[in-house]
Design a protein with these regions (language model features):
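N-terminal, polar/Ser/Thr-rich
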Residues: 1-43
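Aromatic (phenylalanine/tyrosine) cluster motif
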Residues: 633-634, 646-650, 660
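Asparagine-centered strand-capping/turn motif at beta-strand->loop junctions
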Residues: 54-58, 68-70
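Short, solvent-exposed beta-strand/turn "edge" segments of beta-rich domains on protein surfaces
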Residues: 37-47, 54, 131-137, 498-500
Length: 662
């Protein structure tokens, strides 16, 4: 797991012409001095400003890198670096152009930094800072935006990911699509900070919602509400946070289910999306009881890979047990466990839910452990889709996993292709679970996702998902507007929403600046019943936000939607939207160059210090076994001087024998 670790290699070392596993370079830990986080929550959105201060204790100019987890729905839009008092502000460019600018700047001796989303998964962000002088201090400032949803128990959950676990790279994934120039923290234990550093977190909750409570299951918070309970300030005592879990805070509003519509003013001097106004519609549609059916086929897909050891497997077993005992009579079910291979509880297909079949499932439940190797999630999903749903029954898949894989796009594409006949619900297990897979697959499969930890109210979350699974799909969904003058209204993304009874639904709507919105109607058909939710324009709250939070969150929602489909068909649109809003996607990057400072020393003969290294695979992409992770860390630390040789031997052994798990 990553603990905000930054590490560097000598900028005078040429690493561009040799394979990564024999690179003749030294790797140095760069001391982390302080982490300061400021969070501003307004209703159902959050802005996070993270500041990380590092010091290069060596006497060498280093090119330093770090990888950090982010929520897959977060809009990263601003990056700054302050190096020895000089501020460098990044701009968003097309990725290849940004990489070339960075390479040219660093090879010329300038200090520069480059921020990129991982090529294979949207929940990892990489940063390279070139030519950090010996004895220099660097403060890295990242700003991102997040949408927050009301959970089953009525809490608005804010999570700041701080745990970055190794990701398994399946055998059929083309590793060349990974960020081949990134030195990941999984390969270098030096990047996991062991020295003490200060951690400060301040949060503000405001935005017109009366507060009932603010709590955390993991951390001790100091909460100071205002006299009218319309806002609060939250702090965490310095030194009290241990970065072995994702930082989470639950906000309870007094009336979280009330429809809330915000109109954010656009930038009149801009063009496109940023010029127009943006509506954020928050609603909780209710469905009639007749919308829920027992004629369902539920297939549980349980991750038993090595990364699920310990608390994760305990949570998975508890969650599975609750689901098994919550199924209604008359439905059909099956359980598929997977790792490097997969196995079925009922090999011939789903069977009716009876006392006898439940007893067989409980016997399997008692024996479940993290003993099936790698995380080959695609094959069991393909097996399910290879047979049609039972006639007259709606098929639902419930996936329980930590999501620690790199083939997220493959899984999402497969699930999306079959979403018309099979819905997919996902339960993300444990801290550091991949939000890109958990939320991305649920979205692609027209389902819902929940993240669970040991301390969670599991029963409440399980019952909420069971109720959603048993709900018939809402058909013929439409969103209509009564506006003056007519026309010009656009949903972002264009895809119509998936509606679940009582669940928080968020819509983004692009509105021309001169248009008056008189009413909004969301309607559909479920079973033989028509449903309709109508809202008056008088309910809209107008705001002016310099950060353009809603505009950028809408852009991120559109980018996520595009990345489910054939991305190549919309590549130009994705780049255009990213550049216009500053929201980074996998085809763009943030680049900043210190043009004012004189170059650092003589220009190297080649692009020394460039991040463009030949890294075809990182060691930890080859395994999902926690045991092997621990052994690797231990050996690397003990034979630091032979780091490159050891990794070469280890990876070649794994590659030749295809030992992807212990």
């Amino acid at each position: 797991m990553a603990r905000w670790g930054l590490f560097g290699y000598n900028s005078a070392t040429d690493v561009t012409d040799q394979p990564w596993f024999v690179q003749p370079r030294e790797v140095y830990a760069v001391t982390l001095k302080a982490v300061d986080i400021e969070v501003t929550i307004r209703g159902f959105t959050a802005r996070v400003d993270a500041s990380l201060t590092y010091h290069n204790d060596t006497d060498k100019a280093l090119t330093v890198q770090y990888s950090m987890p982010v929520d897959e729905g977060a809009a990263v839009y601003k990056f700054e670096a302050v190096v020895d008092g000089r501020k460098i502000t990044a701009q968003c460019f097309e990725k290849k152009r940004a990489e070339q600018i960075y390479k040219d700047a660093v090879s010329s001796g300038h200090t520069a930094f480059l921020g990129r989303e991982d090529n294979l998964t949207a929940d990892i962000f990489h940063l390279a800072l070139g030519n950090l002088l010996g004895g220099s201090e660097a403060e890295l400032k990242l700003s991102l935006l997040m949408e927050l949803k009301v959970k089953t128990d009525g809490a608005v959950s804010f999570t700041l990911p701080t745990v970055l676990n190794p990701r398994y790279c399946p055998k059929d994934v083309d590793a060349s699509h990974h960020n081949t120039d990134i030195v990941t923290p999984f390969a270098h234990p030096e990047s996991v900070t062991s020295k003490p550093y200060t951690f400060g977190l301040k949060a503000k909750v405001q935005g017109g919602h009366a507060l009932a409570n603010i709590v955390s299951h993991h951390d001790i918070l100091i909460v100071k509400p205002s006299d009218d309970n319309m806002s609060a300030e939250i702090t965490q005592e310095c030194g009290r946070f241990k970065p072995d879990h994702d930082w989470n805070m639950l906000i309870y509003y007094q009336n979280p289910y009330k429809t809330h519509i915000i109109r954010e003013k656009g930038d009149r001097s801009s063009t496109g999306l940023m010029k127009d106004d943006l509506l954020m519609v928050n609603l909780h549609p209710e469905l009639p009881e007749q919308s829920y059916s027992h004629r369902n086929e539920v297939i549980f897909v349980v991750d038993r890979s090595g990364s699920m050891q310990g608390e994760k497997m305990q949570s998975a077993r508890t969650t599975l047990l609750l689901f098994l005992k919550s199924l209604p009579t008359g439905c059909y079910f099956n359980v598929i466990c997977f790792g490097s291979t997969y196995s079925l509880l009922f090999p011939s297909g789903s069977e009716e839910y009876t006392e006898q079949t439940l007893e067989k499932a409980l016997e399997l439940h008692h024996s479940i452990s993290a003993d099936m190797g790698g995380t080959e999630i695609l094959q069991p999903m393909k097996h399910i889709y290879s047979t049609p749903p039972k006639p007259g029954f709606a098929r639902q898949i419930l996936l329980l996993t930590d999501g620690e894989v790199f083939n997220v796009d493959q899984v999402k594409e497969l699930v999306s292709r079959h979403a018309h006949e099979t819905r997919v619900f996902v339960v993300g297990i444990g801290h550091g679970a991949s939000t890109a897979l958990v939320h991305g697959v649920a979205r692609a499969g027209h389902g819902l996702a929940e993240m669970v930890y040991q301390q969670d109210k599991l029963q409440l979350k399980v019952m909420g998902l069971v109720r959603s699974m048993l709900q018939d799909s809402v058909q013929d969904v439409s969103v209509t507007f009564d506006v003056e003058p007519p026309g010009g209204i656009k949903l972002i993304p264009k895809t119509l929403p998936i509606i679940f009874g009582g669940k928080h639904l968020i819509l983004y709507v692009r509105v021309p600046t001169s248009t008056e919105v008189k009413s909004i109607t969301v309607s559909g058909v479920v079973g033989n019943n028509k449903i309709s939710n109508c809202f008056n324009g008088s309910d809209i709250v107008n705001i002016h936000d310099e950060e353009k939070t809603l505009h950028r969150l809408a852009a991120r929602a559109q980018i996520n939607e595009w990345q489910i489909d054939n991305e190549e068909d919309v590549a130009e649109e994705m780049i255009t939207l990213s550049l216009a809003t500053g929201v980074v996607c996998r085809r763009t990057a943030l680049i900043g160059v210190d043009e004012d400072r004189k170059p650092v020393g003589p220009k190297p003969e080649s692009a020394a210090g460039s991040p463009m290294m030949d890294l075809s695979l990182t060691p930890m992409c080859m395994t999902s076994m926690s045991f092997r992770v621990c052994v690797m860390y231990f050996i690397l630390i003990r034979i630091d001087s032979d780091l490159g040789v050891f990794i070469y031997v280890y990876i070649c052994k794994s590659w030749n024998t295809e030992q992807y798990s212990t």
